C-alpha cells in the first residue's frame, strides 16, 4: 500500500538541526507516510546523523554534487509514492499533528494545496517570536481559499503588513503536479516556492489556508542578509514576474496582468534602491556623491530614487 504523504527534505550541511527536523517527521501522528531525504553533497555530519535512523519509512537520496533545494525537491517528487507531497526544510521542524491536520482539511475541502500558519524562530533561539499571520490575524482567523490574484498581492506588499504566502510549505496533491507538468524551478532559489504555488493557481488549483500553525520556520536575525544577496533575490523576483507576464493565463486576465506588472516595477525599484544604498554604506556619502555626479546614468537613477528612499526612511521610524 502506498503512503498517504511523502515528506521531502533537502539537506545540505545542517548537522546542527537535522536530528530535530527528521524526528519531527518520523514522529507524526499520521504514520502512513514516507520521508525522502536528499543529502545534497553535505560536507559535515548531516548524512552520518541521518543514516543512524533504521526506520523503513526513511529513504535517502545522495547527491555527489550540490544541486540546490529546488533540484532536490524535484528529486523527491520523482521518487515519491505518496498521494500527497509536502516539503520540510532541514533546519525547520513540524508539530506532531501537522500532516494529520493538513490531510484532513485537504479531504474536507477537496483541495489541491493546503498550507498552515508558520511559527517564526530566530536562529539560536528555542521559542517562536512571531507567526506568519501575526500581521493579518483578522484575514486569516478561519480556513479560507486563496486565488492567484490574492496570493500575488499578499506577496507583493511589505512583510511588515502582509503575510508572504510564498513562505508556506503546503501539502500538495502529487497527481496535480504530474498532470500539469509542474515542478520547482531550480534556478530561482530561494523563491522557487512562490513560483510553483503561483503556477499551480494559474492551472486552477484549489489552495486552502488554515489559521493554525504547525510548522516551525527558522530564520536568520533581521537585517543579516547581505545587500548582494538581497539584490540577487530581487533579480530573481524580476525574472519570475517577467516569466509570469508571458503566460497566456496572465495575458488574458487584465487584473492579474496589472498586479504582476506593478509587482515587477516595485521589485525593480527596490533593486535600484540597494544599488545606491550599498555604496553609501561602504564608501561614505562624499565619495558616493562625487561618483554619482560624474556618472550621468547613476545620477538619473539616484534622483529617481529620492522619493522612494524618503518613503522607506520615514516608514521605518
Where in the sequence are the language-model features?
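Glycine-rich, basic loop-to-helix element that forms the pyrophosphate-binding segment
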Residues: 63-80, 90, 101
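A conserved acidic beta->alpha catalytic loop
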Residues: 24, 39-48, 65, 89
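Conserved donor NDP-sugar-binding/catalytic core segment of glycosyltransferases
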Residues: 97-135
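C-terminal subregions of glycosyltransferases and related glycan-biosynthesis enzymes
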Residues: 195, 202, 209, 213-317
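Acidic helix N-cap motif at the loop->helix transition within catalytic regions
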Residues: 17-19, 44-52, 93, 97
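Short aromatic/hydrophobic "clamp" motif used to bind/position activated sugar donors
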Residues: 85
